[in-house]
Amino acid sequence: MIIKGSNFSVMDNSGARKVQCIQTLEGKKPTSLLRVGDKIVVVIKKMEKRKGGKYKLKVKKSDVCYAVIVKSKQPVRRKSGIIVNAGENGVILLTKTKEPIGTRLTGVVFKEVQRTGLLKNVSISKYII
């Protein structure tokens, strides 16, 4: 069950590892359940460790960003009758203009993300389930 206050893993190379949902977007009530493809506002809780300092991280700890949910522990039922779920809740971080912050996605992305209209998120992912 994904609600306000849920923790997520970040599935891109923006530099963040763990985030927490602080607000829902697009007319959803704060108490409503969120699904794959919904947009949320998150705060960054944990960052990846920099080794050598050769590259600059795109976000900092305690930054507030937009995100879209790309996979969830909660089972998702499709029209064909197939039920899919993941081992963890995952998001992709977005800018204010709804463009992805990272340039590469790690892990799988559920096909339900396509209904959000964010086609660039789907195009940079390797695995779509």
Curated annotation (Swiss-Prot):
It is found in: Mitochondrion. One of its GO terms (molecular function) is structural constituent of ribosome. It comes from the Eukaryota. One of its GO terms (cellular component) is mitochondrial large ribosomal subunit. The keyword tRNA processing does not apply. This is Large ribosomal subunit protein uL14m. Gene3D superfamilies: Ribosomal protein L14. The gene is mrpl14. Belongs to the universal ribosomal protein uL14 family. Pfam families: Ribosomal_L14. Component of the mitochondrial ribosome large subunit (39S) which comprises a 16S rRNA and about 50 distinct proteins. GO terms for biological process: translation. Keywords: Mitochondrion, Ribonucleoprotein, Ribosomal protein.
